[in-house]
């Protein structure tokens, strides 16, 4: 089995991406056969996440989905999660919370940490909780697409994840923004209504604005901080 420890020795599978799902369904089928219950999907419930959930449900209807519940998400995001639960009742959706409540974080590190040290806030409320969720897990699935940003342009279907000492599976690497929405409309999938209000990328409410640049899907994230990633996808 391909693991973080056996990465160098194991042969990596290849997948064609000239089919209807651009390889995504083939990648997911391989991943769940390979790892069975030893793989989770870390989902933010943005539109790419909805596509992946629908694809995953076709391969493993009772897959485990982890949502990093920072306590700072938009009301609309929580409503989206409820809609997903209704549509896919067999999925095991885990709401993973940080060890520190927002009140405890404020007491220890000051009010509104995201304003004066967003990297620390992301570490406490996203990176550490995901590391905890992946403890004992061999692989995890992510909705990264190469088109999303320069920092994601070289991601592969199967990646050695040095950050979490894991295997990271990215089925949507060849999908475009148009592909994502065509799939959502064709399948009539629920999605976060903030996408219709100028938010192509949605994270925590204090650190997410409508996109400043329509050609940069992540230009509304951490505006003014010179930051476009929460740290989950940076080694």
From Swiss-Prot:
Gene Ontology biological-process entries: cysteine biosynthetic process; hydrogen sulfide biosynthetic process; sulfate assimilation, phosphoadenylyl sulfate reduction by phosphoadenylyl-sulfate reductase (thioredoxin)
Keyword Cytoplasm: yes
Chain sites annotated for binding [4Fe-4S] cluster: 121-122, 204, 207
Pathway: Sulfur metabolism; hydrogen sulfide biosynthesis; sulfite from sulfate
Cofactor note as given: Binds 1 [4Fe-4S] cluster per subunit.
SUPFAM superfamilies named in the record: Adenine nucleotide alpha hydrolases-like
Cofactor: [4Fe-4S] cluster
Pfam families: PAPS_reduct
Active site per UniProt: 230
Keyword Cell membrane: no
Domain of life: Bacteria
Catalytic reactions of this protein: [thioredoxin]-disulfide + sulfite + AMP + 2 H(+) = adenosine 5'-phosphosulfate + [thioredoxin]-dithiol
Keyword terms: Cytoplasm, Iron, Iron-sulfur, Metal-binding, Oxidoreductase
EC assignment: 1.8.4.10
Compartment(s) of residence: Cytoplasm
Any one GO cellular component localisation term in the record: cytoplasm
Family: Belongs to the PAPS reductase family. CysH subfamily.
Name of this protein: Adenosine 5'-phosphosulfate reductase
Species lineage: Bacteria, Bacillati, Bacillota, Bacilli, Bacillales
């Amino acid at each position: 089995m391909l693991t973080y420890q056996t990465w160098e020795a194991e042969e990596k599978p290849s997948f064609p991406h000239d089919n209807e799902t651009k390889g995504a369904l083939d990648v997911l089928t391989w991943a769940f056969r390979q790892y069975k219950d030893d793989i989770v999907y870390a989902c933010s419930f943005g539109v790419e996440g909805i596509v992946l959930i629908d694809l995953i449900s076709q391969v493993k209807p009772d897959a485990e989905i982890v949502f990093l519940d920072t306590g700072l998400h938009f009301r609309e995001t929580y409503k989206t999660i409820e809609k997903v639960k209704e549509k896919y009742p067999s999925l095991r959706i885990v709401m993973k919370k940080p060890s520190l409540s927002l009140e405890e974080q404020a007491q220890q590190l000051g009010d509104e940490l995201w304003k004066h040290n967003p990297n620390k806030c992301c570490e406490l409320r996203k990176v550490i909780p995901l590391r905890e969720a992946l403890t004992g897990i061999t692989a995890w699935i992510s909705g990264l697409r190469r088109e999303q940003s320069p920092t994601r342009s070289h991601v592969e279907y199967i990646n050695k994840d040095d950050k979490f000492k894991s295997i990271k599976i990215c089925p949507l690497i060849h999908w475009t923004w148009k592909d994502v929405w065509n799939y959502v409309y064709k399948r009539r999938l629920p999605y976060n209504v903030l996408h219709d209000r100028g938010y192509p990328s949605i994270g925590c409410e204090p650190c997410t604005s409508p996109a400043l640049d329509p050609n940069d899907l992540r230009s509304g994230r951490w505006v003014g901080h010179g930051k476009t990633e929460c740290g989950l996808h940076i080694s």
